[in-house]
Every structure is written in C-alpha cells, then in structure tokens.
Amino acid sequence: MEQPSAAMLVIGDELLSGRTHDANMHYLAKELTEIGINLTEARFIRDDPAAIVSNIIELSKRFDYLFTSGGIGPTHDDITTDCVAEAFEKKASIRSDALKILQEYYDGKDIELNEARRRMARIPETAELIDNPISAAPGYVIENVCVMAGVPKIFQSMLKTVIPKLEKGLPTLSLSVKIYKGEGDIALDLEEMVKTFDQLNFGSYPFSEKGVHGTNIVIRGTDKKLMEEAEDKVRSLT
C-alpha cells in the first residue's frame, strides 16, 4: 500500500523576517505521521501573490494533499484566499454560510462585524468550510488543498476537523538504537543496511552525553517485523 503524500505551504512575511516562530509544520508532521500520510515537503514563502499562486498550482499537482497556513485574516496582507481562487480559476466572494458563522460569533460578543472582519467570509466557490471553534472565521478545503489559519491554536483546531476526512495510510512506526561509535565508524555498514532494507528509512544522528560520544540510528517504516530485523542488524554494529 502506497502512503498518501502531503506538502505544506507556510505563508507570511512575519515568519521569514524572524518576527514570528512557526509551530504549525511540526504539529502537522506529527499528526500526519500518526495516520500514515507522509509530509514530504514544506515551503515558507512571503506574502507574494505570484509566488503563492505558483506554489499552490505546483504542489497541489505533485502531492495528494497540500496544507497551507496563514493569510486568511482580516488585514490587507491576508491574500491567501485570492491566490487560492486564482490557482483554481474560481471566484472568491463573501459566502453566506461563512458570513452567518461570523455574524453569530460577533453578535454573541457584542462586537461589530465590520468590513475588515467580513473579509474573513470570502471563500472560493465550491470550497468546503473548515470549522474554527476558537475564533469562528473558517478555513476551507478546495480540491486537495486545505487552507487554514496561521495562529497555531486555530491551525490545530482546524486540523482536528480535517483529519477524519483524509485518506489514510499505514501508521509510520519509529524506533531508535543507540550506538556508542561515531558516524564515521559505522557509515559504510549503515550504507549496506540501507540497501538491504530499502523499504525502510534510516536516520543517523550523532550525540554526546557526559563526554561519551555515539550515534543514534532511527529506523522508520510501516512494517514492524522488517523494522525489528533491521534493528537487530543495527545493534550488531556495537
């Protein structure tokens, strides 16, 4: 069974300037791994319409799923929806279903639903809304693209509603073996193991603990029995 693939497009000048720290990619990777979807690529781009459109077109064609974060708020630099609409040749406008959600939310807080906030009801035609239990303004899914907020708490809450609807693969398993040898000492043997167990992924990570040096070998895959065979081979390197 081939694992579904995914990419992530993280949008926002504030991330690339260092003003804001991204937490969404790490969270997405962890959640997708648990349901057998491989997050294969992630890109960080500025609030540049041409770049956003071209990346959406490319990544949505190459991967089973594309997740975006950022750029769907009420301000002038929240341009993701227009870019998504352009990428799929759809019209973006204020949708009555999205507007109703916002109206009820702001009425409940006795806050005016002004023109800026109404912008968050602009959704491409044919898109399916993603629930936002924290601040109401919805994300949406259009074809294989999930468009979500950049604020981590909201991104996470949106993802929880999206995940049950995704086509899942086999859960990716992971195990770690600690070898008290340097990477240079085991590199050739490890290379042969990678060839032998070509259905698995191997990672090599040096460590230093209280003056003792070594290498952590991380094995990832979906076949538990095969992983255990590989683990035995790796342990023989000690």
Predicted regions and their residues:
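Extreme N-terminal starter segment of soluble prokaryotic enzymes
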Residues: 2-7
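Short beta->alpha linker loops
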Residues: 44-47, 97, 118, 181
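N-terminal small/polar loop signature for handling phosphorylated ligands or for N-terminal nucleophile
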Residues: 26-78, 86
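Glycine-rich beta-strand-to-loop/alpha-helix junction loops that act as flexible
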Residues: 11-13, 68-76, 220-222
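Short beta-strand segments
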Residues: 9-10, 68-71, 130, 148-150
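An accessory alpha-helical subdomain
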Residues: 144-237
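Proline/glycine-rich low-complexity loops and linkers
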Residues: 51-54, 79-169
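Glycine- and acidic-residue-enriched helix-capping/strand-helix junction motifs
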Residues: 15-25
